Amino acid sequence: MLSSTRYYASYRATLTKQLMFLTKADFTNDDEKWLNAFGNLLRQWFQIEDWKGNHKKLLDDLKKRDYL
């Protein structure tokens, strides 16, 4: 079983890959595909934040960036 630090790091790596996909992919005519990818990204963020037990930091960050 992975240690908690490695477990968290693996989530961060997956999240980074999703973010790179969202920023580099061409979603010109496919809003549904983009929304699905963005939804996956948010779900992974909430998994990380839930694991850490800290939703406030994530929500504050999303508000600063006008996502909420």
From Swiss-Prot:
GO terms for biological process: viral DNA genome packaging. It holds the Pfam family Phage_C. C protein is one of the proteins involved in the production and packaging of viral single-stranded DNA. This is C protein. It comes from Escherichia phage alpha3.
